[in-house]
Amino acid sequence: MKDKLEMTENEKKEFKDTLNLPKTTLEMRANATKKEPETQKFWEEHQMYKKMTENRDKANSFILHDGPPYLSSEKIHVGTALNKILKDILIKYKSQRGYYAPYVPGYDGHGLPIENKVVKNIEGGRNAVTPAELRQKCREYAHNSLKGQESEFKRLGVLGNWEHPYLTIDGEYEAEQVRVFGEMYKKGYIEKGLKPVYWCASCETALAEAEVEYADHTSTSIYVRFKFDDESVNTLKSKFDFLNTDKDMYAVIWTTTPWTIPSNLAISVHPRFEYTFFEYNNDIYYAATGLLANFLKDVDWKEEDIKVLGTCKGQDLENLTPVHPMYDRKSPILCGEHVTLDAGTGSVHTAPGHGLEDYEVCCKYKIGVYSPLDSKGVWTEEAGDLAGIPYYKGNSIVIDKLKDCGALLAAADIQHSYPHCWRCKKPVIYRATPQWFVKVDKFRDKALEEIKKVKFIPASGEARISNMVEGRTDWCISRQRAWGVPIPVFYCEDCGEVIVTDETIEHVAKMFEKETSDAWVKYSEKELMPEGFVCPKCGKTHFRKEKDIMDVWFDSGVSWRAVVEKRADELNHTPVDMYLEVSDQHRGWFQSSLLTSVATQGKAPYKQVLTHGFVFGEDGRKMSKSLGNYIRPDDIIKNYGADILRLWAASVDYRNDIKIGDNIVKQLAEIFKKTRNTARFLMGNLFDFDPEKDYVNYKDLKDLDKFALHKLYQLIENVTEAFEGYEFYKYFQCLQNFAAVDLSSFYLDIVKDRLYTSGKKSLSRRACQTVMYEILQALVRIIMPVMPHQAEDIWQNVPENQKGGLESILLSSWPEMKPEWNNPELEQEFAKILKTRVIVTKAIEPLRADKKVGSSLEVAVYVKYDENKDLLKSCENELCNIFITSQAVVADEKPADVLNEYTEDGCTVWVTKAHGEKCCRCWKYRELNADGICSDCQEAISE
């Protein structure tokens, strides 16, 4: 007989050919940059979005309404990418759960940023074209931006009704906006008035609160004294004995906007604050008692140089009349609750044309509005010798004039948070102009009541939007620009009547439906109004149309009507299930949608509001090209593919601000690769598995297999919980832990021998394949919402007999948790076995480090673990497979020829050389037959 150690290379190869080595058509490298577009083409050609929605019962629906991104650029920011990805993840998951979950993308196409960009490219500027021509150019710009953004959204793997998105610049949308305006006007919720509003002198338009950003700004603060007139002095003398003097008396105000002093019409005090009168340098002043010390310090007056005379309440000063230091007019003292003790003197400079609180307190005293500035922020003729000077140059001029007349007590630069225009980033002012307002106060209580019915994620969102709605003033919805939806109002030229009727609103709406809102500038008033219409007040027929357009927040804020209700067949109910946007939309789209919806239909337009944070660079700073931390979505996609970007979106706790950068992306690319390798290993070992014929019943599985299914049960349970709670980062953690720890480091590591060396059709191998089949089927479904391209690539390489006729993974259902898989008792047992395995590995590792052994199959282990002896004894036959050693014995005594001894937590492991010789087929050390293989291998070959 030939010696078994004298085996030829050909004979060794023959044994290798008997192994069940993995086979799969799934490539090792994802090659995502090339394959993802091919996958998207497959989805489009096979109408996957249509199939995803048409196969679902509309009675069981999840409607996520898309907040429209602004069309100021063809390129999207990484924050916009995050938003779209989160929406798409949710839509895909809900579809898997059996919901009818359509997605209608939207775009916001009106507004000043687009108008400004268009004007910059017009030779001769705005005045070189007609309003109609300008609007046409803006419309073309918006449509070009839409094409670019749509292409980038699709490249992210976002599925939706791309053939029929909604646009705020479409005629049908604009028509519904006009109808909402008409309904709100009819209810008395919209009015026109002269009132101070945020005004951008650079952009020459009013701004809503949502269009204002706060940034640090250096201003000059000044203290100015106003001398009381003789009548007021006599009144003070008669009221207070301590003022029985012939000295001059002054009120002192503090302001950070010296340029508004020419517009001062009053001084406000708090009726219940205490004010202290004191003498300094032979003059008498007063200041709020709580601010006196700070005031003296600011004007550099020493306390020992003043003489306190007495105190009074603010209400005692009401209607006294100091004289304006620059003009021959009086500035009466008013009582206002807005006065605080934060800074100054407790006497507030009051210019009703340049401050909302100033305006409100002056209204109570029937003091009119005075705002001598034009739309560019230049003083008008009303300002006298200041006429023609821009307000921002006025500070130094006003300060010099106050010095000249002896009214300036002190001036100093301060840095503070100041409102800036969100478009041009320049400081804004308050300016009183005729504007259209939504009178929020008339339905504020109902809006607050509706907020309480909405689920906010995170929960802090409720308080945030509630506080904003509770504290907000009237909503200024008019804008003095060209590119937007015109305010559908007419004025009678004969009697001045403001005309907004059901008839005019519907006529304009129908014209917009046919020709878009461009009709407003294209046609005359006569053509825009119903035929034969006469003024309801005077009966005349001479009309003038409104020139202002609506705030873009009003545009997008009516999408619940213009989109959700108008497309009821597709988006089949209101309120919708969810609005999902970045957190600053509490003051933007969430709020404008809430206000228009409550005003017209008495309810919130959404059931849930989910917000995510802003995206910053890897260093935690705002993204900037100059800082080198700016990263674009298409940069990541070109290098790694879209699924990496999607994986990033799922890996972060989006409720807070989020970081992204090269290092983060590289780490995610490694995780992506490991997930693919895991799936590839599973598929490779299922090449000959037919679930119809080879599936092994649960009761016939080994405990190790049952434990793997228990871990799968837990994975499905945990990721389902994560998705239902919108905590995608927990999904990511669960998936990563399952793939890296439960599978790669444990189950798959252990069963390789069984898969490769057992008989091809043996129960042992088929049992393992059954488990791997279940894991693969679940895993590819679980990764689909987040990594759909990867999931589709895997699915298209799954053997047909394992696909159940499923054309695409997009059409899959969420994995099922079979109750029998849930086995907590088995988990407790395996926790002890796993602990033992770790200790065994620690016992072997020094021998490998010292190169005394190569593979762990070269050793036998003897385990003495009294605490778990019975458990280990019950599965002793499987321990060598679990430990990946040639032999494993539950021992009471130390064996001979021990190579290493290791003890931990009451468990002692003795390591010896393995018994027998190395089987050239399975590489375990056993008793070998004449062919040089062990009996297990001989049995496997003989099948």
Task: State what each model feature region is.
Residues A266, F273-S347, L356, E360:
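Protease-associated
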Residues K2-A32, E38, F42-H46, V119-P262, ...:
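Residue patterns forming the tRNA-binding/recognition surfaces of aminoacyl-tRNA synthetases
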